[in-house]
Amino acid sequence: MLSANWPWLESLRHLGLCRALDRHLVLGCLRVYQQQIQTLKEDEAEFLLFWLTLCSGQVAQGHICLDIELACREPASLLPSGTLPYGMAYQEVKQQLQANPFAQVLQGLQAHPQLVGPQAPFVLRGHRLYLRRYASVEQQIIEFIEQRAQVQLPVPVPVLAQ
């Protein structure tokens, strides 16, 4: 069973990087995953909980995804506007972010395709982690922009002469 008593979890909340809803969403996913598919070791559960909760929290801040590469490289980039990168809570989250190099984070997430995959609650595309519903919305926007870019709109000759 998941303990969910990791100190960095309270630090995420304190910094405004997650809400109770984010934590409960991820804990629910992990519990279903453990019951139906595989038992997770405590360190695997902690790793997944951290990154998936952070992703959900970024969506709550208005971002469409979590840029994992940026988070690993510049932890302060995750902070909500007006939050200063100081204090014990920030140091705890920064330490957790830097516990695994970027490539290991990607491998760790890809190792659990029932949680992070095309048909899973979370989708990994390149270095970005999405809640599945937002990954499809972003793709639809990209396709719409590409279609619009291919349409040749007539421009009146007098406008071209100016």
For the regions a protein language model found, what residue spans apply to each?
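Helicase P-loop NTPase motor core of nucleic-acid translocases
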Residues: M1-Q162
